[in-house]
């Protein structure tokens, strides 16, 4: 129990919110804090046909028994989270493919980027490209990037682009290290 004291947990969750009387489903991440509080981030860059069906909401919602199914809604907040004495942002999957999303989060104060992902639906080749996108974001924004993949490739990348840890494809592993915020 003492080993976990002061530990933060970041994971993915499906999240439902009722906004202005409309049920909205989000692909979200949650950060659980040591004091029992939490915060969430809603994925901004949704993948067509995987997380939403284009134009689906426009016609299916006219049949009111289907008012809350069909797809995720995109998030709109570029959040940073305080973790002890530094600020972090959490990206979900292909949020990391958008330089604008990462740049905005860093502009908002993020000193480190966490990427949580599930690359199971993209075959054997794309997880390698996805990891290289994480590396590109680290170099572009000069911040460390930690990618945690339940399928795909996990790793720790320094702002220089140096990979200090990289798992094998789809490897279940635990790796811990102190990540410097500035290389």
What are these regions (language model features)?
Residues 1-183:
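Enzyme catalytic cores with a strong preference for nitrogen-chemistry domains
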């Amino acid at each position: 129990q003492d080993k976990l004291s002061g530990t933060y947990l970041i994971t993915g969750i499906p999240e439902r919110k009722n906004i202005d009387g409309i049920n909205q489903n989000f692909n979200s991440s949650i950060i659980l804090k040591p004091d029992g509080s939490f915060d969430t981030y809603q994925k901004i860059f949704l993948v067509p046909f995987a997380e939403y069906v284009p134009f689906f909401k426009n016609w299916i919602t006219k049949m009111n028994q289907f008012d809350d199914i069909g797809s995720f809604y995109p998030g709109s907040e570029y959040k940073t989270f305080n973790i002890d004495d530094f600020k972090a942002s959490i990206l979900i999957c292909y949020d990391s493919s958008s330089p604008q999303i990462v740049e905005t989060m860093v502009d908002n104060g993020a000193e480190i980027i966490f990427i949580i992902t599930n690359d199971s639906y993209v075959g054997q080749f794309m997880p390698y490209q996805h990891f290289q996108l994480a590396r590109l974001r680290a170099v572009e924004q000069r911040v460390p990037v930690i990618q945690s993949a339940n399928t795909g490739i996990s790793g720790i990348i320094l702002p220089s682009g140096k990979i200090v840890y990289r798992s094998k494809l789809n490897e279940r592993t635990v790796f811990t290290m102190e990540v410097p915020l500035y290389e």
